[in-house]
Amino acid sequence: MAKKVVALIKLQVKAGQANPAPPVGPALGQRGLNIMEFCKAFNAATSKLEPGLPTPVIITAYSDRTFTFITKSTPASVLLKKAAGVSSGSKRPNTDKVGKVTRKQLEEIAKVKEADLTAAELEAAVRTIAGSARSMGLTVEG
């Protein structure tokens, strides 16, 4: 018989840097889950990623206090800011441009995000990422 799901917990944790401090500790602790077990498993799963990149994770908590988790790819906004070399997006993206990204950079980001995007082709994924870039106040070249 399948285990009963009691909660879905969505967090953004830095790759390879999960620890019992907030947001991980309180979110798992109130569900009675083993915090250190999650931290070790998450850090092992994200060891191939660049340390410190925010990584969305969806934790499924079961009634017997066990859990499973799925890691997603880093948010497009974080990858775009890194590619453009800016610390934050524009407060007024239509009038104030804060940086530039090239078509090649968009393609690289689209390849990283491919599994999480609903786009059927790479070209559609690139257009999606380009739209995100424009909404952040980045100029798309190429």
Swiss-Prot record:
Protein name as it appears in the record: Large ribosomal subunit protein uL11
Record keywords, A-Z: Methylation, Ribonucleoprotein, Ribosomal protein, RNA-binding, rRNA-binding
Gene Ontology BP terms: translation
Function: Forms part of the ribosomal stalk which helps the ribosome interact with GTP-bound translation factors.
GO CC annotation, single: cytosolic large ribosomal subunit
Posttranslational mods: One or more lysine residues are methylated.
Heme is among the record's keywords: no
Keyword rRNA-binding: yes
Self-association and partners: Part of the ribosomal stalk of the 50S ribosomal subunit. Interacts with L10 and the large rRNA to form the base of the stalk. L10 forms an elongated spine to which L12 dimers bind in a sequential fashion forming a multimeric L10(L12)X complex.
Organism: Xanthomonas campestris pv. campestris (strain B100)
Pfam families associated with the record: Ribosomal_L11, Ribosomal_L11_N
PANTHER family: 60S RIBOSOMAL PROTEIN L12, LARGE RIBOSOMAL SUBUNIT PROTEIN UL11M
Membership in a protein family: Belongs to the universal ribosomal protein uL11 family.
Coiled coil: none
